[in-house]
């Protein structure tokens, strides 16, 4: 899908403020409401815009202990990766997981209610058939910057 400057500007604005009104969005990109909204619908239909949501401050709702874990698997093949990734998807306390290159295979973020809860989870993973060779645990002491989905038009134009 080819994106022009209007599409890019729409994406930039919606990534910062998904609740902006149709008229304010149209005004911000210098289009009338109808063509602006048609562009938004086209971007949604094409899968460029996957949805809209609220960023929740989970610290206000429930106190959790964030823990980052570096994980290295025993075997490095498609079956081992698939088995591990299935376990990640089935563990609600895992809020983020990325496969990485370098000395480890995955970085996994757990958000458990207590360190004991995290320890029980990792112990279950270790005795399971998922094939963890070794892991390193890093307990978060302070969040310096929260992830954000907002983007700038400069990011999109490249």
From Swiss-Prot:
Where it mainly occurs, coarsely classed, is cytoplasm
Keywords for the protein's UniProt record, in alphabetical order: Cytoplasm, DNA-binding, Transcription, Transcription regulation
The record ties this protein, via Gene3D superfamilies, to:
3.30.70.920, Winged helix-like DNA-binding domain superfamily/Winged helix DNA-binding domain
Please report the stretch or stretches of sequence annotated as the HTH asnC-type domain: 3-64
Specify one Pfam family. AsnC_trans_reg
Q: Which GO terms describe its cellular component?
A: cytosol
Q: Where in the cell is it found?
A: Cytoplasm
PANTHER family from the xrefs?
A: LEUCINE-RESPONSIVE REGULATORY PROTEIN (PTHR30154), TRANSCRIPTIONAL REGULATOR AZLB (PTHR30154:SF34)
Q: What's the protein here called?
A: Transcriptional regulatory protein DoeX
